[in-house]
Amino acid sequence: MIIPRTGIGVDVHAFAAEGEARQLWVGGLLWPGERGLAGHSDGDPVAHAAADALFSAAGIGDLGTHFGTDRPEFAGASGVTLLAEAARIVRAAGFEIGNIAVQFVANRPKFGPRREESQQVLSDAAGAPVSVTATTSDGLGFTGRGEGISAVATALVYPRLSESIG
């Protein structure tokens, strides 16, 4: 019997300092005119949480293990690139990806009008269905004060049949 595995991933980024030239990337999409997020890579909390959830589900570390700040080759990397690489690593470890679900918490950007576009970009990167939802924290905490964005993701993976026998 093949038993699926679930994982959870979390990512949080503060908005970059005023005047710092950083673009906002959320859900694999560029949000022109919005203040960017601070981070080692592009700071996309949605893509990063999705990648982290994949690693968690496969039991092979986390985002920092694979793409940490000690890895200069990932400085400025796109979240979509990191998600695609995470999916490749998880598959190389003997797993297939069932799906990924992500919820991000922020006052901005307004996500609804671009939800389908984001889901397509992330699904293409992961090679599996990715759904994204957005909410606010009703003015509470750092996201409510507009200081940054957080995201939580779950992933479902299952071992390849050939990997689970014997």
UniProtKB/Swiss-Prot annotation:
Binding site for 4-CDP-2-C-methyl-D-erythritol 2-phosphate: D11, V12, H13, H40, S41, D62, L63, G64, T135, T136, S137, D138, F142, R145
Bound cofactor: record note: Binds 1 divalent metal cation per subunit.
Keyword Membrane: no
Cofactors: a divalent metal cation
Alphabetical list of SUPFAM superfamilies matching this protein: IpsF-like
Catalytic reaction(s) noted: 4-CDP-2-C-methyl-D-erythritol 2-phosphate = 2-C-methyl-D-erythritol 2,4-cyclic diphosphate + CMP
Residues the UniProt record annotates as site (Transition state stabilizer): H40, T136
Gene3D superfamilies: 2-C-methyl-D-erythritol 2,4-cyclodiphosphate synthase
Gene Ontology terms for molecular function: 2-C-methyl-D-erythritol 2,4-cyclodiphosphate synthase activity; metal ion binding
Residues annotated to bind a divalent metal cation: D11, H13, H48
Keyword Lyase in annotation: yes
Keywords: Isoprene biosynthesis, Lyase, Metal-binding
Pfam families: YgbB (PF02542)
InterPro entries: MECDP_synthase, MECDP_synthase_CS, MECDP_synthase_sf
Family statement drawn from the similarity comment of this UniProt entry: Belongs to the IspF family.
Physiological role: Involved in the biosynthesis of isopentenyl diphosphate (IPP) and dimethylallyl diphosphate (DMAPP), two major building blocks of isoprenoid compounds. Catalyzes the conversion of 4-diphosphocytidyl-2-C-methyl-D-erythritol 2-phosphate (CDP-ME2P) to 2-C-methyl-D-erythritol 2,4-cyclodiphosphate (ME-CPP) with a corresponding release of cytidine 5-monophosphate (CMP).
HAMAP family in the cross-refs: IspF
Known partners and oligomeric status: Homotrimer.
NCBIfam families per record: ispF
Protein name: 2-C-methyl-D-erythritol 2,4-cyclodiphosphate synthase
